[in-house]
Every structure is written in C-alpha cells, then in structure tokens.
C-alpha cells in the first residue's frame, strides 16, 4: 500500500503570538523547528521511505519539509513547491491578534470567519504590507487568481488541482508521498480524501505535530489513517 504523509509545519512565530497568519511568510519558532525535526525522526522510526515531496511556497512549510526529510535521512527526495498548498488566506485578518480581532469584531463573528466552511473574512487591500499581489513569488500567476481572502471552500478549490495533477497521480504510480503544508490546506485535502461533508470537516483539526499518515489501495481508497507515534 502506498503512503501519504501530511506534516503541518511546526509552530510558527505567529502561531506562538496568536496572530492570524495566512499567506504572510512567517518563520518557524524554536519549538516549531524542533517539531519538524521530531517529525522526521518519527518517519525514520516508522521506516517510511518517500519517492516525492511537495510543499507550499511559504518558508515555515518549506523549512518543515527540509528539516523532516533531513531527520529522516531522505534529504535527497525531490521536493516540488506550489502556491496551491499555501495556507488559507485570512484576508484583512492577516497579522491581527486573534483575541484583539474578537474584541474588535465580536467573538461570534470571528468564530464564523474562522470556522465556517463558506463564509469569507474581510478582503485584504492590494496595498496591504502582506498582499500577495506585490510579492515576487507570485509574479507568474494571473493577478485574478491571487486571493484577497479565502474560506475553507475556496482553499479546497485552489488546492484540488494540485491533488489531481500531482499528488494523486504519484500515489497511483506507487510512490510514497510527503506533503509539508498548513493546517487549512491539509484540512481541505483531508475533506476531499475522506469524502467529508461541509459540517464534518469543521470538527477536524490538524496539529503542528505529529504527522498524519494515510495508506491507500491501488484505487486510492483509504485503508488506514493514523498519526505517527500514536
């Protein structure tokens, strides 16, 4: 059976500070760096050998991928980066403290923005310091596909082509795959993989550690799902 390992990036500096991060390119905290290394150690202990790895274009996921593969003694494995694996774009909430946002907009409204499947947060202005429209890493994209805010529904619509074009074909080809990504881009793909309803996915949380493993049959039906080390 082929294996797909999802590793959410280790704790970031903004996770630690309780800030909405989204597409802001925030680094790992010291704890997050260690979580990424520990993820790789668990992979090595489990004897999982990868043929292909994918990650986003955000440094916290890229570093997690590299650190985990290094700790697993598999740093040679090919890694492809894609914006389609980026975290959900939190729009105008990006950079705001979650508690302060609740004070400003109300607990209920912020909860809806965070947890609703299809409600968008306020859009990020194009002149915002965190806007992707002026970020060189997205220069090859048509401006119309760069989001100003996303919910989980839109995140799945954005990530799904990468699943269908890259990840799923690799798995069907018998390759074990590592995906170093983000809480919500992983949740979106888990929704698709497990055929979860819009309501069911809202109760799913992806921790920074440990990695989540799916084992598939040749038709990509889930045979087994578990967290490494548990």
UniProtKB/Swiss-Prot annotation:
Pathway: Carbohydrate degradation; glycolysis; pyruvate from D-glyceraldehyde 3-phosphate: step 3/5
UniProt keyword list: Gluconeogenesis, Glycolysis, Isomerase
Protein name: 2,3-bisphosphoglycerate-dependent phosphoglycerate mutase
Organism in which the protein naturally occurs: Streptococcus gordonii (strain Challis / ATCC 35105 / BCRC 15272 / CH1 / DL1 / V288)
Catalytic reaction(s) noted: (2R)-2-phosphoglycerate = (2R)-3-phosphoglycerate
Sequence positions that bind substrate: 8-15, 21-22, 60, 87-90, 98, 114-115, 183-184
Disulfide bond annotation, renumbered to this chain: none
Biological process (GO), any one: gluconeogenesis
InterPro entries: His_Pase_superF_clade-1 (IPR013078), His_PPase_superfam (IPR029033), Phosphogly_mut1 (IPR005952)
Site (Transition state stabilizer) residue list: 182
Enzyme Commission identifier(s): 5.4.2.11
